[in-house]
Design a protein with these regions (language model features):
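Generic structural motif
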Residues: 4, 13, 33-35, 48, ...
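Short, surface-exposed coil-to-beta transition loops
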Residues: 37-43, 64, 102-105
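N-terminal export/targeting and maturation segments
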Residues: 19-56
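A short-motif feature that recognizes glycine-rich, charge-decorated loops
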Residues: 55-90
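Short amphipathic beta-strand/extended segments with alternating polar/hydrophobic composition
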Residues: 42-45, 64-72, 115-124
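Bacterial Sec-dependent N-terminal signal peptides
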Residues: 1-25
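Short, well-ordered, aromatic-rich surface patches in folded extracellular/luminal domains
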Residues: 22-35, 81, 90-150
Length: 150
């Protein structure tokens, strides 16, 4: 009887530890800053809403700034977060800044219940590039776009 109780206690304790050890994604953000014109766009997705904002700091053409805010139903949020492989994202290595050369910097931020992960231009090798652009594609589809730059 003692052995059975001990095994049951051990199994419950192990299950509790493994369930509490998983991080839950609370918010995903993408920030894109483009070179000398200082154009920036910002995507935010969390369990309450989806938001897109684009602005050009210099020159401000008539079509910018642009802002979209949509409600995000809980069932769609769960489907979205299941598509994201947080472990692969954590392993990405930041790349060098491209903005100084009139390029663009891409920053993805994933906030969990335990920590915030921030990666910039993390596409320096084939594996990182695949993970990076797959994540950008998942985010773009949440906004009904074919790609993040559309």
């Amino acid at each position: 009887m003692k052995k059975l109780l001990f095994k049951l206690f051990f199994a419950l304790a192990f299950t509790s530890i493994s369930l509490h050890g998983q991080e839950k994604i609370q918010q995903v953000e993408v920030h894109i800053f483009e070179g000398m014109a200082l154009y920036s766009s910002h995507y935010t997705i969390n369990f309450l809403y989806k938001e897109f904002e684009a602005k050009q700091v210099m020159g401000e053409p008539a079509e910018l700034p642009k802002k979209i805010l949509l409600l995000n139903p809980p069932d769609k949020w769960r489907v979205f977060t299941k598509k994201i492989n947080l472990n692969k994202f954590k392993k990405l290595r930041d790349g060098p800044s491209q903005q100084a050369f009139d390029g663009e910097n891409e920053v993805i931020i994933i906030k969990t219940d335990k920590k915030t992960y921030r990666k910039m231009n993390a596409y320096s090798n084939d594996h990182d590039r695949e993970v990076w652009y797959d994540l950008l594609q998942i985010i773009a589809k949440e906004f009904g776009k074919k790609g993040i730059y559309e």
